Amino acid sequence: MNRSRKAARYGRLAEEVAARHYDMDLDHSEFRGVRVDARGPGGRAFDVKAAMSNRKSSKPRFRLWKDQHDVLTAADGGYVFVLYRAVGRGIRVEKIRSVSARSLPSITWGVGGHRGGGSQVKIPPSVGRSESLMRNHRFL
């Protein structure tokens, strides 16, 4: 299985864990022009972001897209961040947190060479004691 297929498989497993953990419905639907992974209570839109902690080539990071972030922020949507370790064909979740899109710190967006060149940012699970995605935000 190539790296891209493994990433898709692990991402799907992370989505399933997030849906069970937060009692969300996975629907991969379009919401105000962007794709979201799940709906929480009251139809609130969430996107699941997964990062592999045991990557060989680089450190783990979550990739956020500006167009999606803007929609989630305006609609009081959120993210579920899942930090996992790949174990065989499965995953072991190390940390999982849901967070309102509005509660993320100010983001400096860049243009990446992925997904049509849209503005994006890659955020490590821990960017310092005071700005950790996995510890210090207002969780839902």
Residue ranges and their predicted role:
Residues 1-140:
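Nucleic-acid endonuclease domains
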